[in-house]
C-alpha cells in the first residue's frame, strides 16, 4: 500500500436503536444502525410483522372501499 493516500482506521463506536453498542475498526469514529445481531429477527428467532400495505390497500382504506 502506498503511504499517505489511504484513510486511517480508528476504533468506531457502533450504536443500534435497540441500545446495543459495540466497537469495530472503520474510517469513521461513530455509526448508528437500525438493526444489529441482538435485535434482528434472523438472529433472535423472533418474528416481527411489518405489514404496511401497498398502494391499493391505502387507496381502499382512504375511500372506504375496504
Swiss-Prot record:
Cofactor binding comment, as recorded: Binds 1 zinc ion per subunit.
Stored SUPFAM superfamilies: L28p-like (SSF143800)
Cofactor: Zn(2+)
Tagged with keyword Ribosomal protein: yes
Binding site for Zn(2+): 16, 18, 36, 39
Function: Binds the 23S rRNA.
Disulphide bridges: none
Family: Belongs to the bacterial ribosomal protein bL31 family. Type A subfamily.
Subunit field text: Part of the 50S ribosomal subunit.
Protein source organism: Nautilia profundicola (strain ATCC BAA-1463 / DSM 18972 / AmH)
Protein name, per record: Large ribosomal subunit protein bL31
Any GO CC annotation of this UniProt entry: ribosome
Keywords recorded for this protein, A-Z: Metal-binding, Ribonucleoprotein, Ribosomal protein, RNA-binding, rRNA-binding, Zinc
Biological process per Gene Ontology, one example term: translation
UniProt xrefs under Pfam families: Ribosomal_L31
GO MF, one example: structural constituent of ribosome
Signal sequence interval, chain numbering: none
Coiled-coil parts of chain: none
